[in-house]
Amino acid sequence: MKFLIIQKVKREVPIEKWAKLLPLQFKYFDNLEKEKAVEVYYHLIGQQGSMYIVNVDSDEKLSRIIGQDPMFFESEREIYPLTTRQTHEKQIRELLKP
């Protein structure tokens, strides 16, 4: 199962705390990319945030990835389940069958 996660640092986080946690988060995501749990990761320019796509087998794994992020308590996130265009098209065609 793939999920798009958009994560933004809360505005009230002191810059000193943010500066300490950010290198830990970089290392955390390096490890997730090596494990192939994170397929792609991008910084959101001018947003103090990032977006990434995770590929997990369970909601437990998704929860672990999010919960173990060093910036967990300092960020807000939106999580969206993803499907391929082909799967979406197939579902729509089935719905529209007479």
Where are these regions (language model features)?
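Conserved, structured core segments of small domains
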Residues: 1-98
